[in-house]
Regions:
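N-terminal Rossmann-like FAD-binding beta1-loop-alpha1 element of flavoenzymes
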Residues: 18-46
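Conserved N-terminal/central alpha/beta ligand/cofactor-binding core
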Residues: 2-13, 49-176
Length: 176
């Protein structure tokens, strides 16, 4: 990140230039910055309005669920079946549904490796349960603060890499 300061008309401002700006410090923001770093991109900047605020960190519900390919039990599952289930709800475009399904197990196992304690059975399978409109046992949870635990584990991974963050700023426009 390159940083410059300039003044005009009695006001001063800071200009930050980077290859990749990630906006937000919820699970999506952290999970965007972390793999970019792993792929070799070092010129990353995370910008957030409040690192300790936001939906991922501060909501709780008995229905907080992580949705992934089925990783336990006798029922088979496939990327295509999961994509079709997502698409059939008429809220996810087909190409997005396919990407979400294809990367769901990898993303889930990354969270496990970072320390999110998703439940397992005695054979080591990551157990799941059925939700209202899902034909498989794809849902899993660590309780009412699942997304908080995911956020905190991803945040630790990003901080360990030293990815810079600007906190208490609101992104209005990104100039490219």
């Amino acid at each position: 990140m390159l940083e410059e300061r300039f003044s005009a008309g009695g006001f001063s401002a800071r200009l930050c230039r980077c290859n990749t700006a990630v906006v937000g410090t919820g699970t999506a923001g952290y999970n965007a910055a972390d793999p970019l770093w792993q792929l070799g991109q070092r010129d990353i900047l995370i910008v957030t309005e409040n690192r300790l605020a936001g939906t991922s960190r501060n909501t709780g519900s008995d229905k907080q669920t992580y949705y992934k390919l089925t990783l336990s039990g006798p029922e088979g599952d496939s990327v295509r079946e999961m994509a079709e289930t997502l698409f059939s709800g008429q809220c996810v475009d087909g190409d997005i549904a396919l990407c979400e399904a294809a990367l769901s197990a990898q993303s889930f196992l990354k969270l496990v490796e970072l320390g999110v304690p998703f439940p397992r059975n005695r054979y080591g399978e990551y157990i799941g349960y059925k939700t209202d409109h899902d034909p498989r046992r794809r849902a899993t949870s660590v309780g009412p603060y699942t997304s908080r635990q995911m956020t905190e584990c991803l945040e630790q991974a990003v901080q360990a890499k030293g990815i810079p963050m600007l906190d208490h700023l609101q992104v209005i426009r990104i100039l490219s």
